Amino acid sequence: MAEPVAGLLLAAGAGRRFGGPKALAELDGEPLVLRALRTLAEAGCAPVRVVVGAAADEVLALLPDPSQAVRAEDWEAGMGASLKAGLTALEATEGPVAALVHLVDLPWAGPDVLARVAAHASTETVARAAYDGVPGHPVLLGRRWWAEIADAAHGDRGARDWLATRTDLRLVECGDLGSGRDVDRRADLPGR
């Protein structure tokens, strides 16, 4: 990763279908929030911020550095509120040319996936992982677009509507590195 890229982990959801906040769920004895933070760090992202909402105090208690946390006060409004809170917080940081947006419920997207997408960083980048041609996460957003995306982010669609308008969106094929599969229900985790 030549240009500095911030990591933005969205982990504020209540996990209604899951039966509780996914950030607190464990895979191989590790909470998903810590696994995702480690993955962002191993991919070379710095700084890394984690957006919290549901069970915020419990998630904060797990973080090795609570200053990484950004509270999305209106997290119940959906992923858009979390994305807005995270991008707004990153605006105050100097250095990163782009933000790599990662979701807490993607434990099988490893650092190699994240690093491959992050390698396309620039202030004007709009890129996302694809798995066998199907768009997925993480999503790389150049700093130039952060305020515009924060204004457009709403509901559970996050940046989806904004991304749909982009003719410059680059799909970065990662199907050889992972599946992009997410955790929707507890049964999606091994041993459940």
Task: Give the ranges of each region predicted by the language model.
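Internal, well-ordered alpha-helical segments in soluble enzyme and binding-protein domains
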Residues: 113, 145, 155-159
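Short aromatic/basic micro-patch
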Residues: 108, 140, 182-183
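Conserved alpha/beta core of the MobA/IspD/sugar-nucleotide pyrophosphorylase nucleotidyltransferase superfamily
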Residues: 1-3, 151-192
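Short, flexible loop segments at the rims of nucleotide/cofactor-binding pockets, characterized by
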Residues: 26-28, 148-151
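Nucleotide and nucleotide-moiety/phosphate-recognizing core
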Residues: 2-135, 143, 167-176
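Conserved nucleotide-sugar donor-binding
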Residues: 136-148, 186
